Amino acid sequence: MDSEKKNKKKQIAILGSTGSIGTQALQVIEEHPDLYEAYALTANNRVELLIAQARKFQPEVVVIANEEKYAQLKEALSDLPIKVYAGIDAVCQIVEAGPVDMVLTAMVGYAGLKPTINAIRAKKAIALANKETLVVAGELINQLAQQYHTPILPVDSEHSAVFQCLAGEVGNPIEKVILTASGGPFRTCTLEQLKSVTKTQALKHPNWEMGAKITIDSASMMNKGFEVIEAKWLFGVQPSQIEVVVHPQSVIHSMVQFEDGAVKAQLGMPDMRLPIQYAFSYPDRICSSFDRLDFTQCTNLTFEQPDTKRFRNLALAYEAMYRGGNMPCIVNAANEVVVAAFLRDGISFLGMSDVIEKTMERAAFVAAPAYDDYVATDAEARRIAAELIP
């Protein structure tokens, strides 16, 4: 009877369980042990945290992408009946396991693409937190999702908000998707001030707790640029129908305007566990212990236009989206290189946009890329961007 009951729980594979999204997803599972179970946990490098998670949540399988950490992981879990694997190929294979119902793609960057494709082909529901997957290969992912009848449920707070606003609106044309942006820690900085900002300053986001890569992307507004591209593929809208509005309080998570002029918005506390839980429970809503929004404290909700002169990455992302093909893949690869350089003090904050723009000019453009083209583009754009860093 126990095993029968266990099988009724949704079995979730978490790719990137040691990151910000992954750890919060485990909090959701912990709050609803009657509904969800962590079937597989994967991490890139943080083996100590992965060991602690495995001991606590007792998954069937754990995978460490960094093969050098395999022996340490295997030894630490030797007293438990948990299968232990290493390497990116193992991550790609684990998503195909029969018992898995849903795959949460919370890996950072381009690395999330191949496991997501494998999970779609295996007809697993996708809780998509790895936005780079749609930025790099949105057209391919959409084609595969349709071919394999695989649902893609957005975990990004903005796209979850739009998704929730569209509930009950089947057949009602969207006039505009309005993505809100906090503006990041440098919203009020002048161009002159932005020349000298440091990684320590950039890593202090005013509203959200996130990993280092996405926090830098938020500070540079590349994160919002990626979300614009992601929205195009998730919601089937044209680039001209996607608008970004800076909303520093992060209370309204995004909005949809319909052709009659009505606007629906989704509001809530800036807590990623809410969109994670909604992706897990969809189409149902389930109770949570998360903080509630107190409207008496929301005395000042403000909105402003983003400044693409100071934050050029947003304009570059729009340009990539309009050009299509492999251009968003080029932008993503260059961005990953420059963010890594910025985090090791190897490039200035504004210098990141310069390198991305030059990489867009120099990398080979492919109008209708296949998967192999994305792989080649990613490698070429990374090489070009690395050479451009002073």
UniProtKB/Swiss-Prot annotation:
Mn(2+) binds at residues 156, 158, 227. Its cofactor is Mg(2+); Mn(2+). NADPH binds at residues 18-21, 130, 132, 211. It comes from the Bacteria. Keywords: Isoprene biosynthesis, Manganese, Metal-binding, NADP, Oxidoreductase. GO terms for molecular function: 1-deoxy-D-xylulose-5-phosphate reductoisomerase activity; manganese ion binding; NADPH binding. Gene3D superfamilies: 1.10.1740.10, NAD(P)-binding Rossmann-like Domain. GO terms for biological process: isopentenyl diphosphate biosynthetic process, methylerythritol 4-phosphate pathway involved in terpenoid biosynthetic process. It catalyses: 2-C-methyl-D-erythritol 4-phosphate + NADP(+) = 1-deoxy-D-xylulose 5-phosphate + NADPH + H(+). Its EC number is 1.1.1.267. 1-deoxy-D-xylulose 5-phosphate binds at residues 131, 157-158, 182, 205, 218, 223-224, 227. Pathway: Isoprenoid biosynthesis; isopentenyl diphosphate biosynthesis via DXP pathway; isopentenyl diphosphate from 1-deoxy-D-xylulose 5-phosphate: step 1/6. Belongs to the DXR family. Catalyzes the NADPH-dependent rearrangement and reduction of 1-deoxy-D-xylulose-5-phosphate (DXP) to 2-C-methyl-D-erythritol 4-phosphate (MEP). This is 1-deoxy-D-xylulose 5-phosphate reductoisomerase. The gene is dxr.
